[in-house]
Amino acid sequence: MSSVLQGFTKSLAMTFVSEIGDKTFFAAAILAMRYPRRLVLAGCLSALIVMTILSATLGWAAPNLISRKWTHHITTLLFFGFGLWSLWDGFKEGGGGSEELAEVEAELDADLKANGKSPKDSSKREDENKKQNRAFLTQFFSPIFLKAFSINFFGEWGDKSQLATIGLAADENPFGVVLGGVVAQFLCTTAAVIGGKSLASQISERIVALSGGMLFIIFGIQSYLTSVEA
């Protein structure tokens, strides 16, 4: 088992480059323009923290189900696979434009029309709920909070970053992995919520993909060169 610091550092770097231009990053930026920022930030962060803890728990449990030697080899292959995947995406990208930002915005607009709600309608409904009994709970678990939570939680489910977190927690100290992941999620999500669409549109998906690919390859090489007890 590696040190907490090593798990923290690798998780922080991996999560940051995976999330800074991810779909959930763009979703947080767009939602923050339409709804109260504190509710969007709370919902997005809650979902990402829960997902990080779940992923790290799965990774921690993996060596107890199969041998640590096999989990180490699987993790190494995951790093190389995700590295090549990210590099391919990076080389395939055109310029610095954000096509994914436009896709996420279109999906959110479609969802908004399907529900027949506008941000103002949601705010009015929230104000009415506050006047009812259990005002504290309805304020905390507001429709906006739940919307931000669900979009980010299901957006991360089965994503490359989730699988990488599982693999990293199987090979590194799980506490360090969770801590590094949470710090990175906080930094990325806060930047998205504060910066909004203007910041998101300035991010080059190509540079992010190439940086993430190189980082995954480095992790793969380091994992390959690291001996592990059976």
Swiss-Prot record:
UniProt entry keywords in alphabetical sequence: Membrane, Transmembrane, Transmembrane helix
Superkingdom of origin organism: Eukaryota
Annotated InterPro entries: GDT1-like
Keyword Membrane on entry: yes
Transmembrane region(s): 12-32, 39-59, 71-91, 135-155, 175-195, 207-227
Coiled coil: none
Family: Belongs to the GDT1 family.
Protein name, entry field: GDT1-like protein 4
